[in-house]
């Protein structure tokens, strides 16, 4: 009996509308909000991001990413027996975006559900899928991270609205007799709910509280670098590997400073870090699978290499997955 899981296909999707920093600066100026390309690049490393149109939902972006991943794995939607979608921007309050995506794919009948851990969501979802495959509850899972985060942005707050973008990434995770997912490590600390949140909710058809993103950037940075280092070392420990055994670090693409800080703590040079934040911005739960698909399709990440995926997000949540491609 297979006791392991392995990624057999990856995919990604970005909305056609691409905004460079210059584009966004011009739009914000119309609102009386001042910023500049230099200010954004120096603080975040971001040069462009993609925004979805009003009629495009997370399931739409996830569908394209899923189809690419299925094609890369050489499997049909009917072959999938588990669908997990990581998102903080679901199509509806309910049902889950996973169920909506399942219907669009034509993969009806298998378990389908969402995971909500914000920017750590894909790490959580991949870990859950791996656990279900190891237990025998599934053999071939579709794991998707998809976001239309632009819907949550306060475009009067230059410190946050320049950071985020929309997109989706997906993987097919299959049962295997040889290890693919080597180790995972998940954590959360609800004491830090307020440093990164969208505090609004719906009651009686009305929005209560603030429906837009709020973030204490300094607090997030201080927490993120420390916890990501611990999670990375935890999965290396569990797998019996060292930092030097990591071929590629694929971190959540939050901003270049957090990524540089994490790599430095692990003793990894930036030329072994997959970086897409410059072109995609922070796409929350989509950022890691987007970066993974980019690394695979560009030839950076190759079969047999060890990849360290790690993410941190609102909640406060964080985690890491170590895998052999």
Swiss-Prot record:
Query: What EC class does the entry list?
Result: transferase
Q: Which UniProt keywords apply?
A: Acyltransferase, Cytoplasm, Fatty acid biosynthesis, Fatty acid metabolism, Lipid biosynthesis, Lipid metabolism, Multifunctional enzyme, Transferase
Q: Which SUPFAM superfamilies match?
A: Thiolase-like (SSF53901)
Cellular compartment(s)? Cytoplasm
Alphabetical GO CC annotations of the entry are: cytoplasm
User: Which InterPro entries did the record assign?
Assistant: ACP_syn_III_C (IPR013747), ACP_syn_III_N (IPR013751), FabH (IPR004655), Thiolase-like (IPR016039)
Q: Name one process (GO BP) from the record.
A: secondary metabolite biosynthetic process
Which Enzyme Commission number(s) are listed?
Answer: 2.3.1.180
Provide the reaction this enzyme catalyses: malonyl-[ACP] + acetyl-CoA + H(+) = 3-oxobutanoyl-[ACP] + CO2 + CoA
| Signal peptide (from-to) | none
Cytoplasm as UniProt keyword: yes
Query: Where, by residue number, does the polypeptide cross the bilayer?
Result: none
Alphabetically, the GO molecular function entries are: 3-oxoacyl-[acyl-carrier-protein] synthase activity; beta-ketoacyl-acyl-carrier-protein synthase III activity
Asked whether the keyword Transferase is assigned, the reply is yes
Main subcellular location of this protein, as a coarse class:
cytoplasm
Q: Name one Pfam family in it.
A: ACP_syn_III_C
The active-site annotation reads: 119, 252, 282
Q: In which pathway does it act?
A: Lipid metabolism; fatty acid biosynthesis
Q: Where is this region: ACP-binding?
A: 253-257
Complex and partners: Homodimer.
Q: Which family does it belong to?
A: Belongs to the thiolase-like superfamily. FabH family.
- NCBIfam families, sorted: fabH, PRK09352.1
* Role description: Catalyzes the condensation reaction of fatty acid synthesis by the addition to an acyl acceptor of two carbons from malonyl-ACP. Catalyzes the first condensation reaction which initiates fatty acid synthesis and may therefore play a role in governing the total rate of fatty acid production. Possesses both acetoacetyl-ACP synthase and acetyl transacylase activities. Its substrate specificity determines the biosynthesis of branched-chain and/or straight-chain of fatty acids.
- What does the entry note on its domains? The last Arg residue of the ACP-binding site is essential for the weak association between ACP/AcpP and FabH.
Q: What is this protein called?
A: Beta-ketoacyl-[acyl-carrier-protein] synthase III
- Write down the species: Paracidovorax citrulli (strain AAC00-1)
From the broadest rank down, the organism's phylogenetic lineage runs: Bacteria, Pseudomonadati, Pseudomonadota, Betaproteobacteria, Burkholderiales
* Gene name linked to the record: fabH
């Amino acid at each position: 009996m297979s006791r392991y899981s392995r990624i057999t296909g990856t995919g990604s999707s970005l909305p056609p509308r691409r905004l460079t920093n210059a584009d966004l600066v011009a739009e914000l100026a119309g609102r009386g909000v001042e910023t500049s390309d230099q200010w954004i690049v120096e603080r975040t490393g971001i040069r462009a991001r993609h925004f979805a149109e009003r009629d495009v939902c997370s399931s739409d972006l996830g569908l394209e990413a899923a189809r690419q991943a299925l094609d890369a794995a050489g499997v049909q939607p009917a072959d999938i027996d588990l669908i997990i979608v990581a998102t903080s921007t679901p199509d509806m309050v309910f049902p889950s975006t996973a169920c909506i995506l399942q219907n669009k794919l034509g993969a009806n009948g298998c378990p389908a559900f969402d995971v909500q851990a914000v920017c750590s969501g894909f790490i959580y979802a991949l870990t859950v899928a791996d656990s279900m495959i190891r237990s025998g509850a599934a053999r071939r899972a579709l794991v998707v991270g998809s976001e239309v985060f632009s819907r949550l942005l306060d475009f009067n707050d230059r410190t946050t609205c320049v950071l985020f973008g929309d997109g989706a990434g997906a993987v097919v995770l299959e049962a295997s007799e040889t290890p693919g997912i080597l180790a995972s490590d998940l954590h959360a600390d609800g004491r830090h709910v307020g440093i990164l949140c969208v505090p609004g909710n719906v009651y009686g058809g009305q929005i209560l509280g603030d429906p837009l993103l709020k973030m204490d950037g300094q607090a997030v940075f201080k927490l993120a670098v420390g916890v990501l280092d611990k999670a990375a070392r935890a999965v290396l420990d569990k797998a019996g590997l060292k930092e030097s055994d990591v071929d590629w670090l694929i971190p959540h693409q939050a901003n270049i400073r957090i990524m540089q800080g994490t790599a430095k703590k692990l003793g990894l040079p930036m030329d072994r870090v997959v970086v897409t934040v410059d072109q995609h911005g922070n796409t929350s739960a989509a950022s890691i699978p987007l970066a993974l698909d980019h690394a695979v399709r560009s030839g950076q990440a190759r079969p047999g290499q060890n990849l360290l995926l790690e993410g941190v997000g609102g909640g406060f949540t964080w985690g890491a997955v170590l895998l052999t491609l």
